[in-house]
């Protein structure tokens, strides 16, 4: 049974998608059509469902190699939209800056601790990782959004990671 899904991505990310269409089609076993910011995915429902996350990840700024990990059932995509949390732009900018850190240090440290990949694009913070990794990264981001200090967040996340490994 062939079905159809439509996913919207930012127009400026369609170039990256166009350059990698064949690779995605081959790996996900789907057919892609790109019309401005709309991406039409055709294939069997399961492959379509997996390809939707790959397209969303590319739309949220991830490189193709990171996005293709989502074809593996062990990996998930989490998207946190700061526009839904903070109505004012100056608030969003401040919290995005806290998540990124000076020269990307906070983001890099969170990726090291959790094992997940984090991408900031527009008003969103997105995470790709295995279930536990993505959940830890999402928790860390939410703690930063709640206003906890970076060192407290690192401590809490490292402790939770150790508990998961037991």
Task: Name each region found by the language model.
Residues 1-166:
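Predominantly single-stranded RNA-binding modules in RNA-associated proteins
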């Amino acid at each position: 049974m062939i079905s159809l899904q439509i996913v919207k991505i930012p127009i400026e990310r369609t170039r990256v998608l166009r350059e990698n269409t064949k690779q995605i089609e081959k790996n996900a076993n789907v057919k892609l059509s790109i019309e401005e910011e709309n991406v039409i995915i055709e294939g069997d429902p399961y492959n379509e469902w997996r390809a939707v996350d790959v397209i969303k990840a590319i739309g949220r700024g991830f490189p193709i190699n990171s996005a293709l990990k989502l074809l593996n059932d062990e990996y998930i995509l989490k998207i946190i939209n700061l526009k839904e949390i903070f109505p004012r732009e100056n608030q969003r900018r401040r919290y995005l800056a806290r998540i990124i850190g000076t020269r990307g240090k906070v983001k890099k440290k969170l990726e090291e601790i959790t094992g997940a990949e984090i991408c900031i694009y527009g008003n969103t913070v997105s995470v790709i990782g295995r279930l536990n990794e993505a959940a830890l990264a999402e928790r860390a981001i939410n703690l930063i959004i709640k206003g906890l200090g970076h060192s407290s967040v690192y401590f809490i996340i490292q402790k939770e990671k150790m508990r998961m490994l037991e």
